[in-house]
Amino acid sequence: MNIFRSIIVFIVLLSAVSCDAPKLNPLDPANPDSRLGQFYGYVKTALLPQQPIVGVKVSWKNDNRLIETDAAGYYNLENLPIADGTLYFDKDGYSKDSIRVNWQNNKSIDLGTILLNAIPKLNNLIIYTCVENRYQDDQKDTLNVKANITDAENDIESVSVRCTALSFNKQLTFNPKSNLYELNYFYGTKNSVSPLDDAIGKNFEIIVKDHLGRIFNIGFSTIKRVIRQEISFESPANGVTVGSNPVLRWIRFLPGFNFQYMIQIYTREANPQSVWTSQYIFKDDIEVIPDKKLSVGDYYWVIWVIDDFQNRAQSKQASFTVQ
């Protein structure tokens, strides 16, 4: 009986001591003995007014931790071993960023707001070749680039086109009329040491540099074809005299790929002026009549062949006179 009473007293005393002891959670950063910590913050757009960015991947590689920001752009990483490291931020459509975390004896750190810069967006890209047939059996080759690019921050400093395989890197010029970044580059002639044909199938990348010096590779395209076959005119030619509505005829073009014609008439003078253009002429056609009367004077006309990728070739010039 005495032994039983002694056991009861011991249990009661032990319970009393346990109730008076402080309850310290080893995972609680407030616990002075804890070696775990937390940090938190927000991710927003650099563009004003700053807006929260949801779904940003926030990674802490020290502990192989990865979370995403919520609808408010908020993140909170808890129960982390306290060791200095780098926190990374990654979101499609935005430039990557990072921040160095130094605990400095802190166990809970407010990292404030990280601002992500939107990556310039390539909406459309056309890269095509142009071959102009000239007399003396010569051909002039031109590489053309047209890029539609938008940037939320409007901080683009330069845009260039690059082909590493060809050691080619040229800057594009913004055309306010077309709202495009463009390049019209004389590549050489048919007999160039490095002909335009070498560019077929190579990747041409669009590179954007912003005002902070950040570089973005925003997309690429390839050259599909260089049209070397020559389209030949039939009449009028060689300065023949015609009326004000001449019938323009050419020899049927059979290149083995889909295409359309474009016809242009220019004044024949030191500074030629375009007086008439007809586009989207069906590939089976071999003649066209201008839908406007030409004034008395000297002219020449050319035939363009344009494939489905905008690659094109121009005939030699055919001259005529209107009387």
Named regions from a protein language model:
Residues 23-30, 103-125, 232-234:
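Extracellular beta-sheet/turn segments enriched in Thr/Pro/Gly and aliphatic residues
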Residues 41, 69-77, 114, 179-181:
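Glycine-centered loop-to-beta-strand initiation motif
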Residues 39, 47-62, 155-159:
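Short, ordered, surface-exposed loop/turn motifs in non-cytosolic proteins
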Residues 14-42, 47, 95, 108:
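Bacterial Sec-dependent N-terminal signal peptides
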Residues 145-155, 210, 252-257, 307:
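Extracellular acidic, Ser/Thr/Pro-rich low-complexity tracts
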Residues 54, 63-74:
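Short, acidic Ser/Thr/Gly-rich low-complexity loop/linker segments typical of extracellular
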Residues 88-104:
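A short, solvent-exposed loop/turn motif at the edges and junctions
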Residues 76-84, 92-93:
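Short Pro-Gly-centered beta-turn/loop motif in secreted/extracellular proteins
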